[in-house]
Amino acid sequence: MTDSFYISTAISYTNGSPHIGHAYEVIAADVIARFKRLDGYDVFFLTGTDEHGLKVQQKAKELGINPKDYVDKVSKEFIELAKSLNCSNNDFIRTTDDRHKKNVHSIWKNLSDKGDIYLDQYSGWYSIRDEAFYNEEELVKSDNDSYLSPNGNPVEWIDEESYFFKLSKYEKQLLDLYEKNKSFILPNSRMNEIKNFVQSGLKDISISRKNISWGIPVEENNEHSIYVWLDALTNYISALDWCEGSKSFDKYWPADIHLIGKDITRFHAVYWPAFLFSAGLEVPKMIFSHGFLLNKGEKISKSVGNTVDPIKLLELYGVDQLRFYLLSATPFGNDGNYSHELIVNHSNALLSNDLGNLSQRCLKMIFSKCNGRIPNKGDLDDNDLSLLSNAYDLYQKSLECMADYQIHAYLNSIFDVISLANKYFSDQKPWELDKDNPDRMHTVLWVTCEILRITSILLQPVIVDGSNKLLAVSYTHLRAHETLRYLVCRLLR
């Protein structure tokens, strides 16, 4: 039976068009999904859009259109972005989908039946931009002495009737989860932040807003809409038709990884597992909280106004180049920088100069000297064996790197071997061997092609089009190059 693997992105909020930060997250998830498929897993990859809440309601009103018409338009932009980025998501969930609403009502009922929901009065600070409630000690002072959320967004005082969830009830269970599963939240720095937050004492949280029209209504009290985070987080099980008792839910849940931005770690690592504990469901295996993509050192966000249109970047650089830069230039999990100069220099150095140069020099000789067919190898000398050994080690190195989702390290190890192969090719000078030692020339070309084959297989999750084209040119007679299983078979020969 094939092992399953479930990966999700955070669903993108539809208060504006996609920016490069959204592209970064969905590309990263796609790379992981594609790698797992290469390794033989049955992968379910989910992304989608979060379409309810006061921000969306206000934006639609500002534009003079119906909220549903507005989110239909913006959601389509996110769907098209994923396609343009060559993403292989199995599903795209929308919180306005009927299937999602059914699951939200079901999880609310489970929480209520457990005695974990009660009606009370909420008095406190709320950020419309964050769609989040905050305690006063969490707020920061602005230059003019007004309060801001931890993300630097405006907050307002609200005093209204609200349904509450007994988050405080699950404090010990959450701390036990973090203690028993050290990799539940990665990177480790985020785990420490969350543990400190929970250890400081949890308060019950508001899970509804009153008199907000754009949301999923509480079934027993239509004056209330279900708070956007309980609504939004449920998407991960809605896509699997949890409330219908589906086979998909049995197969893929619990999720192997929720891939999210670091600014929403608390919602995923505290509130979501607490909701699941209450509902009697398993928690996800891991929350990977990646850093921000920075525009010249500044966080890219709609509120700051420094967003970058990813579609324009695709037109300027190409999809493989953008995917490669975003995932290789910065250790995954850390904040990363974007600029035109960085993308061009990075892509030129590694894709054009290293991989492109090696493949062009090798394949050109094969077509001119070997009638376009990869030659048979002769006896292998120490130089050949050393390079091949480094290449064959890549399979295990890649598995080790991707086990912790260190995508940059996985790519660096591949390009280290490509760099060695370029030096090998230059040192061996196969173009000088044609007349005096054609057997040796054939061996050098065979070894170089073997490096290109191995690295192209391993690069497929990131450089989707380019690596497949290279494999198609070099190995048109092979149909098994699409999986790592074929790589292993060749290594064991």
Language model features with spans:
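N-terminal Rossmann-like or analogous alpha/beta NTP/dinucleotide-binding catalytic cores
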Residues: 2-119
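Structured secondary-structure scaffolds
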Residues: 2-47, 99-103, 148-368, 410-414
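Cys/His-rich short segments
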Residues: 116-162
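Long, amphipathic alpha-helical stalk/connector segments used for oligomerization, subunit docking
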Residues: 369-373, 391-399
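An amphipathic alpha-helical micro-motif enriched in hydrophobic residues
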Residues: 417, 442-461
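Generic long, charged, amphipathic alpha-helical segments
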Residues: 428-438
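Conserved small/polar residues in nucleotide/adenosyl-binding loops
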Residues: 476-483
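Hydrophobic alpha-helical segments, chiefly the membrane-spanning helices
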Residues: 487-493
